[in-house]
Amino acid sequence: VGVCCGYKLCHPC
């Protein structure tokens, strides 16, 4: 559980 930030996107995971 946390935050995944990739190519110009952030979402909970």
Curated annotation (Swiss-Prot):
Disulphide bond pairs: 4-13, 5-10
Subcellular location: Secreted
Gene Ontology annotations for the cellular component aspect, listed alphabetically: extracellular region
UniProt KW Disulfide bond keyword: yes
Keyword Translocase set for record: no
Positions bearing 4-hydroxyproline: 12
Expressed in which tissues: Expressed by the venom duct.
Keyword entries, A-Z: Disulfide bond, Hydroxylation, Neurotoxin, Secreted, Toxin
GO molecular function, one term: toxin activity
Free-text note on domains in this protein's UniProt record: The cysteine framework is X (CC-CX[hydroxyPro]C).
Additional record remark: Exists in two forms, due to cis-trans isomerization at 11-His-Hyp-12.
Role noted for this protein: Chi-conotoxins inhibit the neuronal noradrenaline transporter (NET/SLC6A2).
Family statement drawn from the similarity comment of this UniProt entry: Belongs to the conotoxin T superfamily.
Protein's name according to its UniProt entry: Chi-conotoxin MrIB
Source organism (scientific name): Conus marmoreus (Marble cone)
